[in-house]
C-alpha cells in the first residue's frame, strides 16, 4: 500500500503572526505551543498538489474550523537561534509526537479527538532582522507491522471501487447531517453502515463516530456493509492520504482487526463532487502476527519528516522580503530593537505610550534634526516641526536631515524639508512642518496681524501635542513657548548649547499641593526678563558656535530624559532625585533628573535640581495667570512694553527693591 504524504502549505499572514508572537509575547520562551492545521477536499487539484495541511494566518490563536475544512492537531516549537534549529533533536520530536498518538489509541482518548490521527509538528526559527523563516514539518505516521495490503486478485472485494451514484449521494447527505452535530475534531474520521431496505432495494446510511465501534455499531451487520471512513484529501486513485496509516494502527491495536473495509471519503458538499469516494478492503500482509497477537504493546516505528521541493529530507526557508510590501516590512522592523528590550533588559517598558506621544519640535536646525532622529528611533510616530528658516550651505554637514540639494535656489524651508526627510527615512512617521516666526520677548511687534496669526497657530499646535521641545537658536525665542506650555500643562523639554557646554532639562509643571517641590524652567535662574540677544552682535555671536559633537550629545540626552519621564506613572509631575545615586528600582529606565549640564572640556555631566522661582519671568504664577486670562493681549503687551514682564513677575522689585524711609 502506497500513501500520499501530507505537504505543508503556510499562508503569508502566519509568518507575520509568528513574528509578532515571538517579539511581543514569547520572547525568549521557546516552549512548544499549539497550532491549528486544516485540510480540505479539493477535487480540482492535480494529485501531486493534493493532501495539503494548511496553516492559516490565525492558526496560533484560533480554534475555529470553517465548515468545509477538517482539523489537524499541530504543535510548533519556535527556537531562539539558528544553531538550536540545526541541532534540535528532530528524531526525538517525531518520536514524542508519535508517542502521543500511540498513547491516545491505547487509553481511548483518541475517540474524543480523532483529529490527532492527522497530527503534525513544526520546528522553526524566525530570523526577525532579515525576515527569513526556517521551518521543517513532520507528519508522524505509526507503522503497522505486519503491514496492511489490499486483498489479492480473485478475493471478494479485492478491487478498489467507487460506490454507485445513488449510494454515494445518500452517503454524502448522511455524512453532512452527522458533521453538523459533532465537534470539529470528530469530522475527519467516522464509521458508516450501509442499510439495505428489503421492500424496494434502496440503501440508507448510518454514520457514527469512531468510538461507536466499541459500542457495537457494526454488530449483526455484514462485512460488506461496514466501512471505516476517513476524509481523504489525496487525489491519487491508488494512494490514500497519510492519516490512514495512523487509523490502521488504531484498527489493529484497538479493535483487534486483521481485515477492514476502508472508505476514502472524497465527496464534497456540491452534487458535482459526489461519486469520488473509493472503497478498498485491506488485510494484514501475513497471518504471522507478533508475539501476543494483535495486542502488541511495543510502540511502532514512527516516520514523517517532510521532504523539501527537491525531494531532500531537510527543512525549508522562506524570505518574506520578497513577498511583503516594503512599507509593511518597515512597520514590522523599525520597532524590533525596542521590543527586544522587553525580552530581558526592561520587560516593563511601555512602548505603546512612547509610540503614541505627539511631539512638537520648535526648531528644525541642528538640535531639531538630531532630536527628531532619536525620537523616531524610540518609536515616536507623530513629529511636528516649527521653524521659519531656510537651509543654507553651512547646514547639511551639521544638520543630518538636510543635504546639498536643499541649499539650492535660496534654500528649502527647514520645517517643510525636515518633515519630508523623516518620511523618506521611514514612511510610517506622521510628520508635518509649519513655517512661522515664534513671537519673541524683546522684539517689538511690527506687524500685529501677522504676529497674532503666528501666535494662534502656535497655540493650536501646543494644544494638539503632548510634548513641546524647545530647540531654537536664541534664549528669547523660548520664552513664549515656555509660558504657553506651562499654562497648557504640557511636558516641556529644553536643550541649549554653548561652545563646549550644554544644558538639557525638563520644565516643571504646576504643583498646587506642594508648590515648594515644583521644578523650575529654563528662565528660573534669570534676574531679568529675556531681551533681544541678536542686536549689535558680530558674526561669531550671531551663529551658534559649538563643538560639532555637542548638539548630538545634548539631543540624545534630551530624548532619553523624555522617554524616561514618559515611563513614570506621574509623567511630567515626576520628582527629581537630589543625588544621582538615588535610584528608583521600580522605574524601567532608572532615575529621571531635572537638568543635565554637560562639559566637554572635562567630559563630565552633572545632574542638577532647580526649583521653580516665584518671580520667574516665564513660569511664575502671576505670568501664567495673566496669560490664561488675557492671551494675545498679554503677549502683545509683553513684547512691546519694556519692563512689563519684570514688573508682573516681581523681578523688578527683586533687582530694585524700594528704599525704606527711616
From Swiss-Prot:
Q: Which domain of life is it from?
A: Eukaryota
Q: Name one Pfam family in it.
A: ThiF
Protein name (Swiss-Prot/TrEMBL): Ubiquitin-like modifier-activating enzyme atg7
The gene for this chain is atg7
Gene Ontology molecular function, alphabetical: Atg12 activating enzyme activity; Atg8 activating enzyme activity
Question: Which species is the source of this protein?
Answer: Emericella nidulans (strain FGSC A4 / ATCC 38163 / CBS 112.46 / NRRL 194 / M139) (Aspergillus nidulans)
Q: Which residues form the active site?
A: 543 (glycyl thioester intermediate)
Q: Spell out the family assignment given in the record's similarity comment.
A: Belongs to the ATG7 family.
Function comment: E1-like activating enzyme involved in the 2 ubiquitin-like systems required for cytoplasm to vacuole transport (Cvt) and autophagy. Activates atg12 for its conjugation with atg5 and atg8 for its conjugation with phosphatidylethanolamine. Both systems are needed for the atg8 association to Cvt vesicles and autophagosomes membranes. Autophagy is essential for maintenance of amino acid levels and protein synthesis under nitrogen starvation.
Amino acid at each position: 500500500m502506497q500513501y500520499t504524504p501530507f505537504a505543508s502549505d503556510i499562508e503569508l499572514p502566519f509568518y507575520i503572526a509568528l513574528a509578532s508572537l515571538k517579539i511581543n509575547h514569547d520572547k525568549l520562551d521557546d516552549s512548544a505551543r499549539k497550532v491549528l492545521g486544516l485540510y480540505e477536499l479539493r477535487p480540482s487539484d492535480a494529485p501531486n498538489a493534493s493532501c495539503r495541511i494548511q496553516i492559516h494566518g490565525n492558526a496560533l490563536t484560533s480554534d475555529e474550523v470553517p465548515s468545509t475544512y477538517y482539523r489537524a492537531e499541530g504543535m510548533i516549537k519556535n527556537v531562539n537561534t539558528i544553531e538550536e534549529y540545526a541541532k534540535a533533536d528532530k528524531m526525538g520530536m517525531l518520536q514524542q509526537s508519535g508517542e502521543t498518538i500511540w498513547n491516545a489509541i491505547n487509553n481511548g482518548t483518541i475517540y474524543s479527538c480523532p483529529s490527532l490521527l492527522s497530527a503534525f509538528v513544526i520546528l522553526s526559527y524566525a530570523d526577525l532582522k532579515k525576515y527569513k523563516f526556517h521551518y521543517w514539518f513532520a507528519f508522524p505516521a505509526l507503522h503497522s507491522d505486519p503491514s496492511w495490503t489490499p486483498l489479492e486478485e480473485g478475493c471478494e472485494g479485492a478491487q478498489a471501487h467507487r460506490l454507485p451514484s445513488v449510494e454515494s449521494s445518500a452517503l454524502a447527505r448522511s455524512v453532512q447531517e452527522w458533521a453538523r452535530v459533532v465537534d470539529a475534531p470528530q469530522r475527519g474520521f467516522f464509521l458508516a453502515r450501509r442499510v439495505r431496505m428489503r421492500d424496494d432495494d434502496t440503501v440508507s446510511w448510518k454514520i457514527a463516530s469512531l468510538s461507536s465501534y466499541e459500542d457495537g455499531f457494526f454488530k449483526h451487520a455484514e462485512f460488506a456493509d461496514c466501512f471505516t471512513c476517513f476524509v481523504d484529501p489525496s487525489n491519487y486513485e491508488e494512494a490514500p492520504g497519510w492519516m490512514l496509516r495512523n487509523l490502521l494502527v488504531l484498527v489493529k491495536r484497538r479493535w483487534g482487526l486483521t481485515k477492514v473495509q476502508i472508505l476514502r471519503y472524497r465527496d464534497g458538499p456540491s452534487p458535482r463532487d459526489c461519486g469520488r469516494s473509493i472503497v478498498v478492503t485491506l488485510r494484514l500482509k501475513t497471518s504471522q502476527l507478533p508475539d501476543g497477537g494483535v495486542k502488541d504493546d511495543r510502540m511502532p516505528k514512527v516516520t514523517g519528516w517532510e521532504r523539501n521541493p527537491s525531494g531532500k529530507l531537510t527543512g525549508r526557508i522562506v524570505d518574506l522580503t520578497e513577498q511583503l510590501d516594503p512599507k509593511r516590512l518597515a512597520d514590522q522592523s523599525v520597532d524590533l530593537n525596542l521590543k527586544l528590550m522587553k525580552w530581558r533588559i526592561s520587560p516593563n517598558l511601555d512602548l505603546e505610550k512612547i509610540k503614541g506621544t505627539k511631539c512638537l519640535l520648535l526648531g528644525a536646525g541642528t538640535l531639531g534634526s538630531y532630536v527628531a532622529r532619536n525620537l523616531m528611533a524610540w518609536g515616536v510616530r507623530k513629529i511636528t516641526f516649527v521653524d521659519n528658516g531656510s537651509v543654507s550651505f553651512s547646514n547639511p554637514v551639521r544638520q543630518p536631515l538636510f543635504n546639498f540639494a536643499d541649499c539650492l535656489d535660496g534654500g528649502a524651508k527647514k520645517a517643510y524639508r525636515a518633515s519630508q526627510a523623516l518620511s523618506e527615512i521611514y514612511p510610517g512617521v506622521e510628520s508635518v512642518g509649519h513655517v512661522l516666526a515664534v513671537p519673541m520677548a524683546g522684539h517689538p511687534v511690527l506687524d500685529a496681524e501677522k504676529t497674532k496669526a503666528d501666535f494662534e497657530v502656535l497655540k493650536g499646535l501646543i494644544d494638539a501635542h503632548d510634548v513641546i521641545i524647545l530647540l531654537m537658536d536664541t534664549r528669547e525665542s523660548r520664552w513664549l513657548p515656555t509660558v504657553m506650555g506651562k499654562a497648557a500643562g504640557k511636558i516641556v523639554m529644553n536643550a541649549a548649547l554653548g561652545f563646549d557646554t550644554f544644558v538639557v532639562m525638563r520644565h516643571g509643571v504646576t504643583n498646587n499641593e506642594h508648590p515648594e517641590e515644583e521644578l523650575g524652567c529654563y528662565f528660573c535662574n534669570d534676574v531679568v526678563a529675556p531681551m533681544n540677544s541678536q542686536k549689535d552682535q558680530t558674526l561669531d555671536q550671531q551663529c551658534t558656535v559649538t563643538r560639532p559633537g555637542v548638539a548630538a550629545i545634548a539631543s540624545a540626552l534630551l530624548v532619553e530624559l523624555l522617554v524616561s519621564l514618559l515611563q513614570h506613572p506621574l509623567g511630567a509631575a515626576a520628582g527629581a532625585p537630589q543625588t544621582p545615586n538615588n535610584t528608583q528600582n521600580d522605574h524601567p529606565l532608572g532615575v529621571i533628573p531635572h537638568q543635565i549640564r554637560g562639559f566637554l572640556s572635562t567630559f563630565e555631566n552633572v545632574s542638577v535640581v532647580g526649583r521653580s522661582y516665584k518671580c520667574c519671568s516665564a513660569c511664575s504664577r502671576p505670568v501664567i495667570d495673566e496669560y490664561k486670562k488675557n492671551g494675545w493681549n498679554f503677549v502683545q503687551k509683553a513684547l512691546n512694553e519694556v519692563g512689563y514682564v519684570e514688573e508682573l513677575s516681581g523681578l523688578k522689585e527683586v533687582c530694585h527693591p524700594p528704599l525704606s524711609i527711616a
